[in-house]
Amino acid sequence: MSTSAPPRYLPLRAAAPASPDHRLSFVRRLPPGAVHKASAAEVFLTDALQVGDDRFEVAAVWHRDRFLHHDGNGRPSDPLLLVETVRQTLIHLSHHFYGIPQGHPFVLIDLEFDLDSGRRPQDSGPGPRRGGPLPVVLDVTCTRTGATPRRFGMALDAVATVDGNRFGRVRMRWEMLHPGLYALVRNRSVRPVAPRPEGALPHRLRRLDPHEVGYAHDDHVLLARDRDGACGEFWLDMKPGHPVLFDHPSDHVSGMALLEAFRQAVLAVGAPLRATVTHLSATFTTFGQLDAPVGITVQPGSNGASASNGADRPNRPLAPRTAQVTAVQGDATLVSAQVGYHLPQDLTHGEVAS
């Protein structure tokens, strides 16, 4: 008589809450493997405590002078730094508190973030700390969305604060898959598409200048433009050796690389004006192949609230402008997102300009 293997993923119960005497520590980063990183320099988390049923407090430290960094000159933090911090959080909580085995792949389904416009957490601490490492606390609530023998789904809601001041919120939904199931799902997603040329960009493509996407150097530029293409059409310029976006080997285009490309695309469409992205709601549909071109398209949406509307609520920022951004490979949509952003002329009302 044959017997089936025991279920790998059960309706797990999180570990018991920590002692009231235990306080979050910001002293030492977690081991890289705890958040699926290869380099210790790319780890933001320093501690995590359970404070209730499926409720956690997580400590992180953001360092300056790095890609995906907080700006020490008083501008709002890069939203993707917050997203990456929460991505590391969902991985660590899944392993440490919910018993998900190491080596089981995580698949991101959707995410949403909102930055509180005008909040500048790097300015809220004492003078000597400004421009230095920034201690961040996440108030996290997890919700289990389903479990089968080879699949475990969860959702997360995280509110980020510095010195008790809220500055953003992130929601994510993901699944952990048994390695065998992941291999099956991954193989099914492989599509016949034209290969990407190796080496230099094709002659018809021009890599964007760093200033078009908010950087001083071209090391971080992820977009190229067809010389005959429309304003909002770009190609992903993959950088497999990038120490942050490709910290460890992957069999697909990373979600963080695509989100950073989306942010750059919105900035490029608004150039020379510098857009500030404050909202994004993205759905991940399928895996992107590493050896085939990825097109990034920006479709402008609403222009946000008018100045007269803003005058009716002088202590609040204008509503953001919006754009629909998609990443396509062949005939498959990899990711689609609605992005909310402000241009400099929008940031002249209320607390945004303070």
Q: What label would you give each PLM region?
A:
Residues V58-R64, Q102-D114:
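A short glycine/small-residue-enriched secondary-structure motif
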Residues T145-V193, R316-S354:
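Mixed-charge, glycine-accented linear interaction segment located at domain edges/termini
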Residues V51-D53, H104-L108, N165, G229, ...:
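A generic structural signal for short, non-catalytic loop/turn and secondary-structure boundary residues
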